[in-house]
Amino acid sequence: MEQVTVDGGTGVIDTTSVPTQPELPQSLRIALATGQMRRPLGDTLRPLLDLFADGEYQVTGPERLAEDRYLTPSADWPPADVSRVGYYRTAIKSGHRPVAVVLETTGAAVILDGHHKIAAYREEAILPHLLIISPLG
């Protein structure tokens, strides 16, 4: 678990409502797709964190989704790109653990990135691996 500070954030991602799915830089998309997350997570996730409003946040993971946890999609569900889901299914079957990013607030746990990954995990009957970002305070 890490505590990170956003200073000079754009506020594009609103933690008080269901945000839209953000566009991430390729380097971060690759890290999430492969599950190879470098620490500190605050540095690795900085391009995403800079979309949040200024404040303190907690970043945890990667960790498996709890069986009783419900996730709210920020994009179409189920994902329309079946080939992308298939790509992640193949990766998961071969032992890779791609990581989805979730914004957890008091009202919901919203998928910011990883809709295809989560769909693939579900089709493989494996609990998804998540990075969880939560506002503090």
Label each PLM-derived region with a short phrase.
Residues 24, 31, 40-43, 47-110, ...:
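Short alpha-helix boundary/capping and kink motifs at helix termini
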Residues 1-37:
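N-terminal extension/subdomain marker
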Residues 135-137:
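Amphipathic, charge-rich alpha-helical segments that serve as recognition/docking helices
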Residues 125-127:
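Ligand-binding loop in jelly-roll beta-barrel domains
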Residues 131-133:
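Generic beta-sheet signal
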